[in-house]
């Protein structure tokens, strides 16, 4: 795998662990941070699927203001939210939390052909399924306009 997606997949692992511990608020925080990381790697579909997962958990969440998270990046509200969460869950803190889970990122990453495929798997879907879900959501949004 070529791209450095360690922080993205770390946040996704922590989101998964939070879901298993029945901590939906914490899961949403990690999904939001993962989405921001995905955007920085031009993985807009991963970011937008994280957005859908956040809205599924909390339909009134701030991310609902935007149709895509690429649009959200233009907003100072998005910047403030991400900045606040990054202070709380810095790279170092996230890596410490991941160590507690006993996950070896290098070993896991070796089984995927791309960082995007790895990220999709941590969201519980294949990349193709994520793209299909997003296509349907976008079509549905267009038909209601």
Regions found by a protein language model. Give the residues of each.
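Generic helix N-cap/helix-start motif at coil->alpha-helix transitions
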Residues: 6-11, 26-28
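Canonical tetratricopeptide repeat
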Residues: 11, 44-45, 64-65
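Hydrophobic/aromatic side-chain positions at a characteristic register within alpha-helices
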Residues: 19-20, 39
